[in-house]
C-alpha cells in the first residue's frame, strides 16, 4: 500500500495543479516542494523497510500485469531519483520566475517524478516498458514548454527517438515470463530456429533503450532537448 501511495502522491498532486490557482510563486513553491519532499521521504521508508513482495496494480491478461517491487536495483535508481528531484525543484522555483506558464511546468514536473519512480519500481519487463513509454509522454510537454519553433522541433525529435524503445515488446513475445529473472527470461524451445531473428530483436531493444538513455552514439536527441527549461534538462 505504501508503494502505491509513493507513486500516487506526486501523480495526483501534480495533476491537481492544473485546477489550482496560487496567490504567489512562493505558495506554489511550497506546495510543490512539500509534495516532492513527502514523496522522497516515503521512497526512503520503502527502501529501508523493503521486502521482496510484488504488488500488482492490474492484470492485462493471464501473463501480463502492471506490477511493482522494491529490489536491489530499485533501491539504486529510486534512491538517486529521490535525492535529485527535491534539489532540482529548489533550482526550478527561481528559474521559472522568468518563464511563462509555471503552473503547467511544475504540474508535469511533479507527475514526471511519479512516473520515474514507477519505472524504478517496475517488477517485470512489461511494466518497465509501459512506464518508460509513459515517461516519454509525460516529459514531452516539458521539452516543448516554450512552444517556439525550436522547442517544437526538439520535441518531435525527442518523441521520435524515444518511442523506438518499443522494440522491447518483441523480446517479451519470445519470453516465458515478463519478470526480471536472473539468467534470462527466454524459452529455448520457443526460439528454436529463430536465433538470428532473436539477435536482431536484441539489437532493436539495445538501440531502443540506448536511445532513451542517450547512450553513445544514440544521443542526438539530448542536445536538441536542451531547449527545455534547465531543471528538466538536468534530470533528463
Identify the meaning behind each predicted range.
Residues 1-9, 72-82, 125-138, 196-209:
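Structural signature of hydrophobic alpha-helical transmembrane segments
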Residues 83, 90, 167, 207-213:
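Hydrophobic/aromatic residues within the transmembrane alpha-helices of Major Facilitator Superfamily
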Amino acid at each position: 500500500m505504501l508503494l502505491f501511495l509513493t507513486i500516487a502522491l506526486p501523480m495526483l498532486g501534480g495533476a491537481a495543479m492544473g485546477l489550482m490557482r496560487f496567490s504567489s510563486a512562493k505558495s506554489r513553491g511550497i506546495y510543490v516542494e512539500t509534495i516532492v519532499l513527502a514523496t522522497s521521504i516515503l521512497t526512503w521508508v520503502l527502501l529501508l523497510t523493503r521486502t521482496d513482495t510484488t504488488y500488482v496494480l492490474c492484470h492485462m491478461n493471464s501473463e501480463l500485469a502492471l506490477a511493482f517491487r522494491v529490489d536491489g536495483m530499485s533501491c539504486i535508481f529510486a534512491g538517486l531519483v529521490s535525492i535529485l528531484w527535491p534539489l532540482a525543484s529548489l533550482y526550478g522555483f527561481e528559474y521559472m520566475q522568468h518563464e511563462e506558464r509555471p503552473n503547467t511546468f511544475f504540474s508535469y514536473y511533479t507527475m514526471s517524478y511519479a512516473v520515474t519512480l514507477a519505472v524504478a519500481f517496475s517488477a517485470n519487463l512489461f511494466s518497465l516498458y509501459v512506464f518508460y513509454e509513459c515517461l516519454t509522454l509525460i516529459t514531452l510537454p516539458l521539452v516543448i514548454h516554450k512552444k517556439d519553433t525550436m522547442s517544437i522541433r526538439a520535441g518531435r525529435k525527442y518523441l521520435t527517438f524515444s518511442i523506438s524503445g518499443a522494440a522491447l515488446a518483441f523480446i517479451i513475445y519470445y519470453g516465458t515470463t515478463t519478470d526480471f529473472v536472473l539468467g534470462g527470461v527466454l524459452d529455448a524451445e520457443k526460439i528454436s530456429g529463430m536465433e538470428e531473428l532473436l539477435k536482431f530483436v536484441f539489437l532493436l531493444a539495445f538501440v531502443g533503450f540506448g536511445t532513451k538513455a542517450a547512450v553513445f552514439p544514440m544521443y542526438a536527441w539530448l542536445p536538441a532537448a536542451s531547449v527545455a527549461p534547465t531543471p528538466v534538462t538536468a534530470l533528463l
